[in-house]
Amino acid sequence: QELIHYLWGSNELPKRMPDKIENNFKDSRYSNLKNLKQINRLTIDMEHQMKSIIYFFEPNEKNGKLVIYHEGHGGDWIREIDTIRHFLGKGYCVLGIAMPLLAFNENPVIDFPEFGKIKLEFHNQLHLLETDEFHPLKFYFEPIAVALNYIIDEFNIERTYLIGLSGGGWTTIIYPALDERISHGYSIAGANPIFLRLDETDYFDYEHTVPEFYRIANYEEFYVMSSFGEKRKLVQIFNKWDTCCFSNDLYKIYEADIKKKLTSLGKGTFENYFDDTYRGHKISKFGLK
């Protein structure tokens, strides 16, 4: 609750619905997906003119489960169309979400009294919005919460999985700790704990190291919280030949401690894999399995 209060100034997640729902939205890039009934385009308005545009891929034949695919700083979820195709073909509803300011999301111009007019185009600019009462980290999590408010009841979702690549992988480590509606999280090339960030490039992403946030709960505690619960699981996959980031197996340093803590709590699973089957920064066939 302390984390939720930090983000929203409340003791609970947002209860509201998307501000706009466009049913049967047309995007020709996805016209060849098998088992696709339609795309619903969701718009979620937030403070400081920020918007999140989300695609909900509804299958013809549903299995009652939802996969949220969260893209990283590469932009649009079209980059992982193979992942969307894979799960849609198996009857999963699929939600495509992008990081703040990327893909179809808004890039507002903010007139700061202290700094002048600045167009927000890069996530590392978001810290400029920080005040004692407002924390821009919420922009990373609020779209998921609001989208789930609509989708879970409207489409009779029984189980929800969160899959994220890169920046989306970081989101996958953090968000399930805030929202127990996420049963399984699969983070690909997501993040290392702060004490294992050994290079200048490990500190490139503002959201990874906000001191006030991680003093409430550090990464090791997020691993536990996002794994904890009946039939809940957090899985991390790191690519040995990743061309972007976190191409290491440093999880071996803390993995046993997290598993020991979960054993003492009595429920929850934490797993890690080192994928050497693919060279690049994406979800491999091994990862999809």
Language model region names:
Residues 14-61:
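N-terminal cap/lid segment of alpha/beta-hydrolase-fold proteins
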Residues 63-67, 90-94, 156-160, 179-184, ...:
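Loop/turn elements at helix/coil->beta-strand transitions in domains of secreted/extracellular proteins
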Residues 68-71, 188:
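Alpha/beta-hydrolase
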Residues 70-142:
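Cap/lid segment of the alpha/beta-hydrolase catalytic domain
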Residues 145-208:
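Primarily recognizes the serine-hydrolase "nucleophile elbow" in alpha/beta-hydrolase
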Residues 184, 193-266:
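The feature captures the conserved acid-bearing segment of alpha/beta-hydrolase catalytic domains
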